[in-house]
Amino acid sequence: IKGLVDKTDATSTEASASEMGASPYTSQVISDMSKQSINAALAQQITDLEKEVGQAEEGEAKLELLQQLANKWDDIAKPIPQGYIYEEMAQQNPTVTYWLKAGDAYRKGYTNLQDTALASALTTKAIHAYESAIELDPSNLSAKTGLGASLVVGGGNPMTGISLLQEVVKEDPKNLEANRALGLFSLQSQQFDKAVERFITVVEQKPDAESYFYLATGYEKIGLRNEAISAYQKSKELAADPTLSQYIDRQIAELSKSN
């Protein structure tokens, strides 16, 4: 739940396609940055695998090595380098699956990231990945959802993103990711009643601490205190974050005083 209590908007920097070309965040730079926070033995395993990838010829064997590398990063919850790997795989073998995996990894990577420059670069890369997936499959709802969410966050054209997300929920009213993204936008734009509707749909399908937190925030903002307290309590039950729990306790105490 990192970033829920800290209100810093780490992904507000607008990105453009030209920035991606000039980005200092190469695959190697990202890999080196990511290795700094893991143990030396695991970092060496990844380095060795990267050398194998570099020596491999284009084709199935190289794709298999890249998949092994992506899996290594996934095992330790490092989506940013994983995104770069899936993008390389998509460039070698352009499929909707690879482009979607790249976009999803980039989007997961930029969410709540406090490095605004890197977040901007990742948002741009996510947009490119989802657009590439849509070129291959124009009706793909996952790609439309990812693109819409990325445009809302930092693509410089949030209303286009909103239109895409609304298109998704029109076709698939219960779509989890589209409802979540629309709910977050509703909170940011202070449309709290709409946010509540979206997050009710989300928690019905996937009751997690983050979604209940946002639902509680929406309830609180429209004056439904009892509902807000209940949703905050649900969030606390599902969270494994002492900082968030302390924040929720304070919110519940304030709401209880008001009753």
Language model segments and positions:
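N-terminal leader/linker segments that initiate helical-solenoid repeat arrays
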Residues: 1-80
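Short coil turns that delineate tetratricopeptide repeat
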Residues: 60, 93-94, 138, 173, ...
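Helix-start (N-cap) detector for alpha-helical repeat units in TPR-like alpha-solenoids
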Residues: 63, 96-100, 141-142, 176-177, ...
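Amphipathic alpha-helical repeat scaffolds of TPR domains
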Residues: 21-29, 44-48, 59-68, 94-113, ...
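Structural signature of tandem alpha-helical TPR/SEL1-like repeats
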Residues: 43-46, 77-84, 113-129, 154-167, ...
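Canonical tetratricopeptide repeat
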Residues: 68, 101, 105, 146, ...
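Position-specific recognition of the canonical hydrophobic site in helix A of tetratricopeptide repeat
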Residues: 74, 107, 152-153, 187, ...
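Residue-level recognition of tetratricopeptide repeat
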Residues: 71, 91, 104, 149, ...
